[in-house]
Amino acid sequence: MSQEGKKIDQMLFWPPLLLVAIMCSAIILNPEAGTNAVNKVFSFLTGKMGWTYEVFVLANLGVVLYFIFGKFANKRFGGEKPEFSTLSWLGMLFSAGTSAAIVYWSPIEFYFYLTAPPFGLEPMSPQATALATAYPLFHWGPSSYALYVGVGVVFGYLFFVQGKEVFRPSTACESLLGKHASGYLGKAIDIFYMVGIIAGISTSVGLGTPLLSEVITKITGIPHTLGLDATILIIWTVIIGISVYGGLDKGIRRLSDFRNWLGFALLAYVLAVGPTAFMFNNFIDSLGVMFNNYFRMSLYTDPVLKSGFPQDWTIFYFAWFIAFALSTGIYLARISRGRTVREFTIGAMFSGVICVYTYFMVFGNYTMDLQARGVINLAEIIKAHGVPYAIVEIFSTLPFASIILPIILVLLFISTATVINSIAYTLAMVTTAQLKTGEEPAKWNRLFWAVVLGGISLTLIFLGGMKPLQAASVAGSFPTMFIMAIILIGFIKKAGKEWDISDETKPSDSTDTKDN
């Protein structure tokens, strides 16, 4: 890489930073008022505006289906052969689904739907049981991953057809906004993008950190306190600082690859020692229940019974995925040079879905079997100790748990460290003025944003409970939803006229491509 781009774009650096600082300070100085404010924001956006998330997500899925079957399907991201072999490319897409969040939710999400089901069903009833394992597949399924893929098509077009370097989403809005995308409106778009991604990662870290602390407590006996959570966040920041200033970025990437293999090994082990036949049978049954109820799940707002189920779960999940959509779409596009739109949309969407579905099939059904056989009582454990403790207790029932728990510790630690590192890098790129191809943002800028991400995550943990974590994603992603709409509408309007179709008939042979 050439010398670092060190000049900061003041209009992009300070506004999101000040917003985060004001919010964190207010919460720390008056936690009760902070909690009330968080609850009000969450209630307004999910109760009054929640339908917008659902309509947008379903419409986005329709756009992605259009990309698969419509006139763009055979158009290629650049005239070259694919950069990576098909097997390597699918492997990178598949491994992108491994995260601390999926380790957190996959063993236990069904329980919340079983005890407080949608559609007015009786808790713990057979009908609630069927939906309990189907709903996670919906929340982490095609509609959610399509959010990444839709904008990913646009970024692939910008990167490899138009030859543009896209570090900020405002660049992708030029097709619809014209010169305004380079002015104050463009700055506002980039600021909202930063706020959304900060909120999304804060939710992820806020989930993963207490779980990691509980694993440490189980292994070492060290009490789980806010101080332990803070220590973990500090260690992550130090590791990122060492990687940045010590030139160990390649080491971080290798750790990310190791994390993926570790996750797959853990899945294989639980699949082997757990109720394998039940896992497959219940997973297939859950798929059927999900597809049978897909449109109702997609548009369920519960205005009559007002159970809060779609607000607390469906809208939260959609908002969380939206928060990461632009940055993930950029990543997916960057590794997909030479692919057709159809190849990209199918590969990127279903590789991620298959990965997370594997986690839910194995971990979720393992827990359900434990609960059914009376090995654990989730209701009592969660009431007495909380969700992270319950998840650790689930994994503690595995044979050789004394070996498995340290493996989970390493998996969680690496997963969260790599995601903080990547998001800090993204924020540093966005806030660097006139960054050119081959240049890196300043090292201090990357480390600074890692500290900011850790600080806001700790603030949300300090408030306690799920609501602050959910509210962060819902509030932060609301503007991002409109940015995505601008990007998609502008692309369809412009690319429909300008995209060269001369490469449509070129073969997608990847035998001569490099394997990475």
What feature does the model see in each segment?
Residues 105-119, 163, 271-293, 353-386:
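Extracellular/periplasmic helix-exit of transmembrane alpha-helices
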Residues 1-6, 31-45, 64-83, 132-139, ...:
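Membrane-water interface regions at transmembrane-helix termini and the short interhelical loops
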